[in-house]
């Protein structure tokens, strides 16, 4: 079973306007994006709004942060499952991505509620592509891997196919920075 690839999560203030364009309410907007590898390299996402009143409760009662994070992780799993169903694709294993999202959002909500600054987290992912296996490239075409390789997914920067050795060199450069 393949995995859904988590790309990005963000938390920030979002103003809701009435039909005349006047500010009506201020909410916290949570945005989550991912890539359903089984379908293609198409990015998917959803937004979740939290009222300012509930945000105040979350500040006073930290256990509400965990409740909200669990709720958003369930929304993510549900949205991804519905998408797979629509495309008649094998369901993704969401457990790893949900756990990663939970960890990121717990940190994010604490940071956002303490500092009142927008929080954004990019999840870089690595997919192993064994020699001979087929993969779908960004152009939507299917290709066969000519050697053991990996696809490194950088949120916002696209995807990059590379060999294990190239990946190790890239990681060493990043670790030195």
Predicted regions span which residues?
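Negatively charged, low-complexity tracts enriched in Asp/Glu with abundant Ser/Thr
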Residues: 1-15
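Acidic, low-complexity, intrinsically disordered interaction modules
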Residues: 21-165
